[in-house]
Amino acid sequence: VPTLVTDQGIVHYETYGRGRPVILLHGWLGSWALWRNTIEELGKDYKTYALDFFGFGDSVRSQQVSVDLYIDLVYQFMEKLGIVKAPLIGHSMGGTVALGVAARYPSKVVKTIIIGSPIVGSSLNPILKLSGYQRIANLVYTFPFLKDSAIYVLTRFGGREGAATYRMVAEDAGKVAPQPFFQSIGTLRNTNLVEKLPLLQIPILGIYGKRDIIVDPRQGKLLLQYAPSAQQAWFEGSGHFPMMDERERFHGVVREFLEKRS
């Protein structure tokens, strides 16, 4: 199992394929497993890296976690592996992190694809907003059926592949301890990228599912409004997980954007 020791902790990641590097970043309660099909598809032409953020999947850290920490984690990950620059693909919280990396370390990012990502934290489903409070998180972990019920509602409804998505998210969420559970979503809830977006000169693609009930899909309009070089792909039949709901089209859109000359 590939791991990397950074200043902040131990990072688990998976890599597949050959060619130019592409880095994939999962969302809240997720892990690299979200990208299992994507790294197989992109790995035909690219060297793909899918990492677990601290506190998720198999990455280890005992201290506080935050979106800000994850931005620095991606930078350190690239530095340690000798990746000079690369496109970043991020789902949900991972997309917010990807935009943060592009703003803080512009020389490292060629282009970004964000999928169902919040530009402002107020776009999160109320269940996610509440999860950012320690008291609520403690309650959820005291009564596990609360977490299971919330995951069921958020994943089963909205997308076409709700059953498969629920199984994947429930398995990943089972590995997450209370601290990263509420700390990461708490900092995501307070996110506001409106001031940073106009500074980004790289190509940005926002993929949003029309049936998303986890992050308001109208965030795509904010992206287009504030990012000078952004474009949007609208997935009519998808919820929060277009890579599950409309897999073939998703991979086609991602590949086309990656291959387009900047």
Predicted regions located by residue number:
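Gly/Ala-rich beta-loop-alpha elbow adjacent to hydrolase catalytic centers
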Residues: 90, 94, 98
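Conserved alpha/beta-hydrolase catalytic His-Asp/Glu region
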Residues: 123-129, 142-199
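Catalytic active-site module of serine/aspartate enzymes centered on a nucleophile-bearing elbow/loop
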Residues: 230-262
